Amino acid sequence: MASLPDHLRRGMKLIVVGCNPGDRSARVGHYYAGRGNEFWPLLYDAGIVPELLESKDDKRVIEFGVGLTDLVKRATRGAEEIERHEFAEGRILLAQKLEEYAPRVVAFNGKMVYEKFAQCKCKLGLQKKTVYGAHVFVLPSTSGLNATGQGVKRRYFRQLGEFLRRLN
């Protein structure tokens, strides 16, 4: 199954890290293209990007200082299909990307994504730890499969947007 290319540039204000490309995203070749995925409206609502983008516009996030990547690059129908060694390899590769691209903030799209990366439990929101100098923010997963209500997702995305504005 296909994967998605990273959309990254050095010195971005934010890099968003997903778990891995979903089946639909891999088929259409764009991030967060799954039916019911709320990523793009939440990103706009939080003021992180100045216009409402769609998955087909994913490359444009770089214009707004936002990058996209995944912890595991192999597309699957669900995260349960990811092998333990893929998470281990993904941790190493993501650490290298964060060191190389040096974002101000790295946001993990889903608690499980950060927990697999950091190998520790966490709460949603801003974390006390930094990674290669980047502040770490954990968002609720935007997947349509996540039962977390839209109000909770919106609240954390807005907190991230406010945090980014305070950094400027």
Indicate residue ranges for each PLM-predicted region.
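Short glycine-/acidic-enriched loop or helix-start segments at secondary-structure transitions
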Residues: S25-V28, E115-Q119, T148-G149
